[in-house]
């Protein structure tokens, strides 16, 4: 192979690797943004529960839409034997 062909192949391989890496970065960034949104909703739920004594149904349904389950957070404290 001539040096120009090697350079072209190396450039194509580098572009493919860059696309894969940036795709992974974008996927992880979306996960982080989703987690921040979930954390904000949970914080608002906790704050409203402390203020009013009950939880907001709208925010619970928003969390349910994202697939987040509110419930038992201490797996070592289970009384369902």
Curated annotation (Swiss-Prot):
Ion channel activity is inhibited by hexamethylene amiloride in vitro. The keyword S-adenosyl-L-methionine does not apply. GO terms for biological process: receptor catabolic process; symbiont-mediated suppression of host innate immune response; symbiont-mediated suppression of host type I interferon-mediated signaling pathway; symbiont-mediated-mediated suppression of host tetherin activity; viral release from host cell. Its main location: host cell. It is found in: Host membrane. Residues 28-81 are cytoplasmic. The modification Phosphoserine is found at residues 52, 56. The chain crosses the membrane at residues 7-27. It is a single-pass type I membrane protein. The N-terminus and transmembrane domains are required for self-oligomerization and proper virion budding, whereas the cytoplasmic domain is required for CD4 degradation. The cytoplasmic domain is composed of 2 amphipathic alpha helix that form a U-shape. Homopentamer. Interacts with host CD4 and BRTC; these interactions induce proteasomal degradation of CD4. Interacts with host BST2; this interaction leads to the degradation of host BST2. Interacts with host FBXW11. Interacts with host AP1M1; this interaction plays a role in the mistrafficking and subsequent degradation of host BST2. Interacts with host RANBP2; this interaction allows Vpu to down-regulate host BLM sumoylation. Enhances virion budding by targeting host CD4 and Tetherin/BST2 to proteasome degradation. Degradation of CD4 prevents any unwanted premature interactions between viral Env and its host receptor CD4 in the endoplasmic reticulum. Degradation of antiretroviral protein Tetherin/BST2 is important for virion budding, as BST2 tethers new viral particles to the host cell membrane. Mechanistically, Vpu bridges either CD4 or BST2 to BTRC, a substrate recognition subunit of the Skp1/Cullin/F-box protein E3 ubiquitin ligase, induces their ubiquitination and subsequent proteasomal degradation. HAMAP family: HIV_VPU. HIV-1 lineages are divided in three main groups, M (for Major), O (for Outlier), and N (for New, or Non-M, Non-O). The vast majority of strains found worldwide belong to the group M. Group O seems to be endemic to and largely confined to Cameroon and neighboring countries in West Central Africa, where these viruses represent a small minority of HIV-1 strains. The group N is represented by a limited number of isolates from Cameroonian persons. The group M is further subdivided in 9 clades or subtypes (A to D, F to H, J and K). Belongs to the HIV-1 VPU protein family. This is Protein Vpu. The gene is vpu.
